[in-house]
Amino acid sequence: MPRGILNANQNKTYAKRYAQEKLKEAGLDKTEWKALSTLWGKESAWDHKAQNPNSSAYGIPQLLKMAPGTPIPKQIDKGLQYITKRYGSPTKALQHHLEKGWY
């Protein structure tokens, strides 16, 4: 985990690298990374402090039960757990998002 205060771009870079590693550990390929990157880009622009003005969704994955201030690794881990449990993969989650406007 990075030390000290990071600027917004460094946080986004760190979050993306962390997510790529988690996907790699799960044996998922670059297609899944591209889908995840697109999905969370649409949801939060990879901003770990993103707040949805219309709901309680927060953070990179825009989860409803994500507390403000949740560390980036925990946001990524919880987001990937949600995607895996609900959709099976980032590509399926992105497809749902493209069809419905949410995931």
Describe the residue ranges of each PLM region.
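Peptidoglycan cell-wall recognition and remodeling modules
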Residues: 4-103
